[in-house]
């Protein structure tokens, strides 16, 4: 039996400050550019002000990319275009600066943190800072067995909470959240199908590295079989993550919830982070107010999850590579929204009150005797 009480998060997590958001909206009304003319950037600036409890909004100066990594046993069925147990190679590419996410992060001057939760490699193959939270080597094959024991699921969840605390304590003011996994999209599809009450075929996508039709059918069958195992434990989110999630997904769920509790905004990347967010919403319904959907990855399960959480993706560029790359592309939009909200000047007071030059002209009294003046 787990000693973790997930219900505590419902009490710990508050919505972003509604009063501050109204103040931000009022300030926006006073600025020289008409309200609404900046599109979603207006909404983003007001959301960020509420998250920060600050008007004018502060710039996003210390963002961080946090990637949770793990291998999934279900990949051995040929449901991924990548070899089973090869996620450590992707992690090395990130650490060496050769992955799309690390290249983008370098360009945007954003540090990247990788957290190994269940990579299928020897722990000494990677730096201690990467592997210190590892729960196990690989996750179980979810179509026929649990991904984790309940104790492992709790340990992974608590690790995610600890990472969120470390980031908040270090002054990180926004997190770009992603995953580095092989087989992770299959587990994510199962979680989303279970929580949304949909069939396997509706949520099964092609994955980050697109698979062919035969692999898609194998993936769909794996999702269907895992879904049967998920339904009996739907009422217990930790049991659900143990049954059909994985150590990386359990950790991401804990990370998302604790980030919301610590009032750290998070940009979600693809279907894996969306699945963890959906589990988090089931635990604490106010938590999604602290998250942004960075992009539409094209995975049908992601669309289902975001719709359920009422999150609209900021970008739609078809980025399927994972590793937080799509969400990273949305970061400059958030930073731009903050800059515009904070730095656009306000209208002069006389113009706001309708007392500008034109108004003064209109209100000037007519001379009493124009003819006398003419003489």
Curated annotation (Swiss-Prot):
Q: In its UniProt entry, what is this protein called?
A: Nicotinate-nucleotide--dimethylbenzimidazole phosphoribosyltransferase
Q: Where is the signal peptide?
A: none
Q: Which domain of life is it from?
A: Bacteria
Establish whether keyword Glycosyltransferase is in the entry: yes
Involved pathway(s): Nucleoside biosynthesis; alpha-ribazole biosynthesis; alpha-ribazole from 5,6-dimethylbenzimidazole: step 1/2
Q: State the organism named in the record.
A: Streptomyces avermitilis (strain ATCC 31267 / DSM 46492 / JCM 5070 / NBRC 14893 / NCIMB 12804 / NRRL 8165 / MA-4680)
Q: What is its EC number?
A: 2.4.2.21
Composition bias of kind Acidic residues appears in 351-375
